[in-house]
């Protein structure tokens, strides 16, 4: 009888689902950077006259500041090349950028701005010292308040790409440029989000090294 009981226990253990890697999604190598419950590894940048930062309804709320509010990632060190970061963002108040991502290009910082300069400009700041409003990435994406948008940035040796929903809005060769950020968002390095006189919500923040991505995704 004892042999039977032990056999049943071993069989049950064998058919249990394997544990998921800590902090990682079950699919495609993505790792969650926000649990939807607390700021966790995200901290307020404490800009002068910045707005309130808190967690509400599963999102990080980056309140409207005078002029800016921001958060910065203070968790375990992440790769600075051959990676992608994705998030969802919504502007609930204001008409300027609401979830601008500062991210590293190897050792240099850069910012992906969506709906900056009064809502009219989307692009990377800065390339060869030029802002998103005056460089090769300058474009316009119409943003509506109270609507969620999916955003993503990917960096490799040969490309920097960025998407808003399914539209690729940035594609450049990083070897052709030097990268920097405006001094106002320096506190968002290496990874951080900022808003300008606007309130933004950010959720579903995910990161993956392209080394962990399935082959079908590495060229997307």
Residue ranges and their predicted role:
Residues 1-4:
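Positively charged n-region of N-terminal signal peptides that target proteins for export
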Residues 6-17:
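Hydrophobic h-region of N-terminal signal peptides that target proteins for export
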Residues 15-220:
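Carbohydrate-interacting regions of secretory-pathway proteins
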